[in-house]
Amino acid sequence: MAGGRYRAGVQQDRRTPAPAWRVTSGEPDPGTVERLLRSLPDWFGIESAVEGYVAAAARMPAYLAWPADASASANASEPTRTSQPPGISETAGTSEPANPSQPAGASEPADASQPAGALLAARHYPGAAEIYLMAVDPAWHRRGAGRALVAALEADLMADGVEFLQVKTLGPGYQDAGYERTRRFYAAVGFQPLEEIDGLWPGNPCLIMIKSLRGPRP
């Protein structure tokens, strides 16, 4: 997992001006992950699942999305890089809804110096990775934090030769409005549904979505 990285990109909401986002990666941050998960009971409402994600967050490097104009920085000495993420969240995924044309669902948080979103990624093989977890504070939904996190991860993975990225989320076999938005978000950032399977999460269908990180072939 890449560490100590920085990017900034401007995300444009058609109705509500979106902030620029600064994405950092490096050290585990279980405290931030727990705060974000507990702000999203409609997606992360099972206590044992929250505890499991927080335990994983204690050992996995975290990508964090910060409002770029926040007064506090995660690490002012980090090397910087800039990118313009392409215009576009839950279990092994994210909680950020997909449609940036809708106004933000909640007012901007008073303390913009805290990370608005977090992403954890797993490398299963040299050429394949997974979004293990992504969560965005509901006050920042539809403001571009989720897409900035995905873009930062993809840039690092492609630089390291990774060809495929997957995410697992609740499948359409279980009707849930929140997870329907999650699936739309992943489709909007380029993921394709591969297979819905039973048994991985007892009583809940798991949808595997994948994305190729390879550029167009000559």
PLM feature spans:
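Acetyl-CoA-dependent GNAT
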Residues: 16-88, 101, 109-133, 137, ...
